[in-house]
Amino acid sequence: MAESILDRTINRFWYNLGEDCLSESQFDLMIRLMEESLDGDQIIDLTSLPSDNLQVEQVMTTTDDSISEESEFLLAIGEISEDESDSGEEPEFEQVRMDRTGGTEIPKEEDGEGPSRYNERKRKTPEDRYFPTQPKTIPGQKQTSMGMLNIDCQINRRTLIDDWAAEIGLIVKTNREDYLDPETILLLMEHKTSGIAKELIRNTRWNRTTGDIIEQVINAMYTMFLGLNYSDNKVAEKIDEQEKAKIRMTKLQLFDICYLEEFTCDYEKNMYKTEMADFPGYINQYLSKIPIIGEKALTRFRHEANGTSIYSLGFAAKIVKEELSKICDLSKKQKKLKKFNKKCCSIGEASVEYGGKKTSKKKYHKRYKKRYKVYKPYKKKKKFRSGKYFKPKEKKGSKRKYCPKGKKDCRCWICNIEGHYANECPNRQSSEKAHILQQAENLGLQPVEEPYEGVQEVFILEYKEEEEETSTEESDDESSTSEDSDSD
C-alpha cells in the first residue's frame, strides 16, 4: 500500500511540474526516490529524506482492520532551485491532497493561470520586507574609508586635509625604519588618497632631496584646493588669516542669549587664529558683547582670573553660564511667587498696619453658554433690493446745459439772457462790453464758442482813455481863455 502511494505521489508530482520545470537537484531527487526498493509493510516518511529542498506534510489516519478503506494523505512538496536559494527567497509549497481511491485532486486553475491558492496570498520576499535600522552615518554626508582623503565636491576641505595630514605624519613617525625614503612616503600618500588629491600627488614633480616631503604635499594641497599660497609665501597668508579673524570677531554680535553656544564657538575659532598675547583683550571684548549678563560676567572675570586663566576663553564662558543659571533660577522663583497665597503671611508676625486701604483684585466671572435659545415666532423683515444684478439708474438732478455749435441755447455774456450770442445782443451798443466786441470785429476777430479748440492764442486788448482826457483838457483851456478876454 505504501509503495503504491509513493508511486502515485511521484507520478503526480512529475505530471504537475513537468520536465521543463525541474532543476538538476530536483531531477536527481526524484530519480533517487524511484530507485528505492520498499517492502509492503514499510511506511514511508518523506520528511526523513536527506534533502534540504524537500518539505513534506503528511497526515495519516489508518487502522489495522481497514487501512485500504480510510487512508488520507496531505502531501505538500515544495522545492526551490539553486538560483532562488542563493537569492534568499522563501520556498513556496504545493499542496497535493489524495482521495480514498489513491488518486489526487488537481489544484483548480483560473483562466489559464496557476492555482488560485498561489494568487490569493503571496509571501513577501526579503527585498519587500521593511526592517527599521538606524543610519550609520549622517544623512547627506559623504563617508570615506578609514584614512582615505577624498575632497571631490566637499565643503570642509581644510578640515579633511588637516586630519589626513595628521594621520600620515603619525604613521611616518611611528614607523621611521619603514619610511626613510621619500619615495616610500609618496607611495603611502598616494595610496591614502583618491580623486583629485591622488592625481595631484601622482602628476606633480616633488623635490625629494631637500625639505620635508609631507610639508610639500600639504602646502601644495592648500594652494591648489584652498587658494592659500602656502608654498611661496606662507607667512603672508598667516598674517592675512589673522587680520580676517580680527575683523570677524569685531563684527560678531549676540542679540539673543539663547544663541550663546553658537556665538562662543564662532568667536573662539577666530580667536585662536591670532597671537596668544592678544587673548586677554579679545576675551574682554567677548564678554562685553553678551547682553544682560555681560557686564557682571566681565567684572567677575577681572577679579577671579589669574595666571593662565587670563588667556582662557573657556573660563570666561564658564562665568557667563553661571550668571545665566542664576537668572534662570530667579525667573523660576518669580513664577512660583505668582502662585503664592498671601493669606499664609498671617502665619508669621502680626500685621503692623491698621486702617489702611484694602487692596482688592477684580474678580472675573466665567461666562457660561445658555442652554436654550430665545424663540422668535416671526421672521425678521428683509430689506427688498430690486435690480441687484442690473445696471443702476441714473440719478435725477440739475445738469449743466450743453451749448453745441450752431444753436442759440447759451446765455449771452453781455446781458446774461439766454437765447442769443453776444454779437447779436440788442444791448451791445449801450454796454461797455459791446464796444470791446465791436473793436474785436473791426480787427477781424470772431467770437468762438469753444475757446480751447485748435491752436490756442491769447490776445490782450487794452482800452486807453488818454485821447479823451487830452480833448477835455483842451476844451477847458479854451473856455478859460474866452472868459479872460470877456473880463478884459
UniProtKB/Swiss-Prot annotation:
SUPFAM superfamilies according to UniProt: Retrovirus zinc finger-like domains (SSF57756)
Region feature Disordered, mapped onto this chain: 80-143, 463-488
GO molecular function terms listed in the Swiss-Prot or TrEMBL record: nucleic acid binding; structural molecule activity; zinc ion binding
Residue interval(s) of motif Nuclear localization signal: 121-124
Alphabetized InterPro entries for the sequence: Caulimo_coat (IPR001988), Znf_CCHC (IPR001878), Znf_CCHC_sf (IPR036875)
Coiled-coil parts of chain: none
UniProt signal peptide: none
Biological processes annotated in GO: symbiont entry into host cell; viral penetration into host nucleus
Compositional bias of kind Polar residues: 134-143
Family from the record: Belongs to the caulimoviridae capsid protein family.
Protein name: Capsid protein
Organism lineage: Viruses, Riboviria, Pararnavirae, Artverviricota, Revtraviricetes
